[in-house]
Amino acid sequence: MSGTAASPHDVPLSDRRAQDVPAHWLLARLGKKVLRPGGRQLTTRLVGMLPLRGADVVELAPGLGLTARLLLDAGPASYTGVEGDTDAAAIAAQSIGARGTIAVGDAKRTGLAGASCDVVLNEAMLTMNTNAHKGEILDEVSRILRPGGRYAVHELALVPDDIPLASAEDVRLSLVRSQKVNTRPLTTPEWQSLFAAHGFVVEQIVHAPMRLLHFRRLLADEGVRGTLRIAGNYLRDADVRRRVNTMRAAFQRNEKHIAAIAIVARKATASTPGSAGEAAIQETP
């Protein structure tokens, strides 16, 4: 996932106070490149699970463009990113250059032609939408996918599957307050039911620990130099430091109840209708 990195002043909302910025853009301001719940490892694994060579690929909310480069390296026929933030779209376009196309658009209404792609992928995006908006996004993905096309996501899950409703709401509110985004993770069965309700057959599920701000994960995702850069920026700004500490505390407090989840689902056809049945579920250490 190498390539041109955005400077702290290029990332969206770089003019806002640290306490007001959504968590992912605050971390990008620090110089963090990998912003997904399961880190570089789960993203790489998810991309490797997809039939990308010769495929028409769409990525929703490509952000800084790191996953876009992984997708492009797999040899698709075409790549289109649809990004809702104009600043992020500019960063992603710079990241991939002439290898693909970045459009500014809404994941619920992409403006893309129906049945025009084979694979759609998004990361850490459905989680940040209400349940109603999740459904609208899945309907849009179904519209633009060809029959039998794959939809892949890398999101946040609540664990265990039978977490009490009160505990789930406590986790959600804690994440909303610390992340400054409308974080609404689901349990694995709830994710499966959501996909089935909108015409998808879930084929594969992979879980991984949610350790976005753990030191070992930082090293694995960012490398030694990247981790040192992040640490330097963290130490130089007291407001950023306080906000990151709040985020880390929320993650640690809820660590037993949140995990990263990757899902690959197939657009159902008349002969293979959607189902919330068994999928291959794997755990990543």
Language-model features, listed with the residues they occupy:
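Class I SAM-dependent methyltransferase Rossmann-like catalytic core
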Residues: V21-G38
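Class I SAM-dependent methyltransferase SAM/SAH-binding core
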Residues: L64-R109
